[in-house]
Amino acid sequence: MLSNPKRTRFRKQHRGRMKGISYRGNHICFGRYALQALEPAWITSRQIEAGRRAMTRNVRRGGKIWVRIFPDKPVTLRPTETRMGSGKGSPEYWVAVVKPGRILYEMSGVAENIARKAISIAASKMPIRTQFIISG
């Protein structure tokens, strides 16, 4: 899976703030089962990948998984024990900005109990409270 954008217009971004709920990406589009965020957070590319791997390992063949979020925000960090000033730190990792209501993963092609189990394992990898939802 692609863990960061191929190219961006600017190397560094402001942190911004997460207010309100997600109006886009809050409906199931591709699969039958989904994992929905209940809290706002930054989810790193590593966390997204860990969740995807956990789900894939759990459903094995048969199931199809869609990742509905993409880490497109660079997070900068200053080197440790560095004095303040002399500009902004260098980009260290990428995050996806997630608001409440956003669908993180979708799944289809498996029984509900298997999907519930796989999605709960993926949910434990996330830094936020989530819920399992079924389309229809």
Swiss-Prot record:
List, alphabetically, the PROSITE patterns matched: RIBOSOMAL_L16_1, RIBOSOMAL_L16_2
Keywords on this record? Chloroplast, Plastid, Ribonucleoprotein, Ribosomal protein
The record's GO molecular-function terms, alphabetically, read: rRNA binding; structural constituent of ribosome
Instruction: Name the principal localization, coarsely classed.
Output: plastid
The leader peptide range reads none
Q: Which GO terms describe its cellular component?
A: chloroplast; ribonucleoprotein complex; ribosome
Q: Per the UniProt entry, what is one GO biological process? A: translation
Q: Which family does it belong to?
A: Belongs to the universal ribosomal protein uL16 family.
Instruction: Cite the record's note on assembly.
Output: Part of the 50S ribosomal subunit.
Q: What is this protein called?
A: Large ribosomal subunit protein uL16c
Q: Corresponding gene?
A: rpl16
